Amino acid sequence: CFGMPEVVSYNIYPLWYHDTQADVYLKELYDWVQEKTEGTGKPFLVTEIGAGAIYGYRTPAEVKWSEEYQASAIQKQLTAVFGQEGCSGVYVWQFCDGRVCDSWFGTRPRTMNNKGIVDEYRRPKLSYETVKRIFRGLDTYVN
């Protein structure tokens, strides 16, 4: 199916939905696309990365759903993306927390998608500063 689209894109969540290190996972995925599919040479985008956090849940243990874990996971994901030769861009999923339908109750605390770098009231989580610092540190960042 890579023969038809002009761009190859993937939504990946290393360190969130699986424990694979972000750089290892992305390199294996990118190499597979380049070597084994019709996506060779096409622009490659990471169209979703992220991890969930409950606003205000902070713990030095860096457990899932904590702001510390989210900031650390996103930092590792973005570092992997910007370090991957041939990767053309990335989207952080998502800017703000948002409600989801009731059927997600078992995996979504508060019936929310809590992957925002700010909460539903636009209060920044720790990951907000992490994302800002990483993007502002890029040579291509335009202020």
Locations of regions flagged by a protein language model:
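Substrate-binding clefts and catalytic carboxylate motifs of secreted carbohydrate-active enzymes
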Residues: 1-143
